[in-house]
Amino acid sequence: MASHDKRDYQAELTDAALAADLATAAGELLLEIREEIGFDQPRALGDAGDRLANSLLLSRLRAERPGDAVLSEEAHDDRVRLQAGRVWIIDPLDGTREFSTAGRTDWAVHIALWQRTTGGVADGRREITDAAVALPARGNRVYRSDTVTAGAVTGGVPNILRIAVSATRPPTILHRIRQKLAIEPVAIGSAGAKAMAVVDGDVDAYLHVGGQWEWDSAAPAGVVLAAGMHASRLDGSPLRYNQLDPYLPDFVMCRADIAPILLGVIREVWQ
């Protein structure tokens, strides 16, 4: 397996460029792991992917941003992050189930940088300052917050809203939304793949209820917001990161033009 732990670290990389570089490197490593281990033992494949990608990212961040804190799905939660001014929120492998299944491409790598705001004002746009989401099995495509643009949409608000949901755990609120809006659920694997489908214009929204962790949505939200789209809690309040408890109960990411409509319906039916 080739080494992805760079020796010639580039201190001049911007935070956004570093996020993209890290996502790319982790994606390349995960593709190699998939090739070498194969799919006969999915649990072993997933465990190796989680562990080795996490090790790579932590090593790179220690070398290139030694003063920053890290919150990772695959590492101990060091509460020093709560006093830190800069925290990298990472998911080395988003969608372990999909990664471990032959032919699936809807898994991702998430890299986000949270920075403390001043004056007590905080929202998703200001807190997640730099982000990258890689889809390694789709040509290792990387969506980065400093270059992303939303996919072209035409014809105004669609008659039927395409909403990305979990294939295994679709949110129950969809039934109530359907009583008010014409919707088409679209099953997609990982959180990152769902959110980037919104960015690409393949779906109109990504709705999640039932809880995730900060690393599941930080980088996707950073990219979605940078693309000029909407990301918030279901009640419309800002997404908050680097919290004492990194559990995030719900969120919606969607086209900016449908956000008022979708949030309005959610307010009507959500209890």
From Swiss-Prot:
It comes from the Bacteria. It catalyses: adenosine 3',5'-bisphosphate + H2O = AMP + phosphate; beta-D-fructose 1,6-bisphosphate + H2O = beta-D-fructose 6-phosphate + phosphate; a myo-inositol phosphate + H2O = myo-inositol + phosphate. PROSITE patterns: IMP_1. GO terms for biological process: 3'-phosphoadenosine 5'-phosphosulfate metabolic process; sulfate assimilation. Keywords: Hydrolase, Magnesium, Metal-binding. Mg(2+) 1 binds at residues 73, 91, 93. Substrate binds at residues 73, 93-96, 216. It is an enzyme of class 3 (hydrolase). Its cofactor is Mg(2+). Mg(2+) 2 binds at residues 91, 94, 216. InterPro entries: CysQ/Inositol_MonoPase, Inositol_monoP_metal-BS, Inositol_monophosphatase-like. GO terms for molecular function: 3'(2'),5'-bisphosphate nucleotidase activity; fructose 1,6-bisphosphate 1-phosphatase activity; inositol monophosphate phosphatase activity; metal ion binding. The keyword Flavoprotein does not apply. SUPFAM superfamilies: Carbohydrate phosphatase. It holds the Pfam family Inositol_P. The keyword DNA-binding does not apply. Phosphatase with a broad specificity. Its primary physiological function is to dephosphorylate 3'-phosphoadenosine 5'-phosphate (PAP) and 3'-phosphoadenosine 5'-phosphosulfate (PAPS). Thus, plays a role in mycobacterial sulfur metabolism, since it can serve as a key regulator of the sulfate assimilation pathway by controlling the pools of PAP and PAPS in the cell. To a lesser extent, is also able to hydrolyze inositol 1-phosphate (I-1-P), fructose 1,6-bisphosphate (FBP) (to fructose 6-phosphate (F-6-P)) and AMP in vitro, but this might not be significant in vivo. Homodimer. This is 3'-phosphoadenosine 5'-phosphate phosphatase.
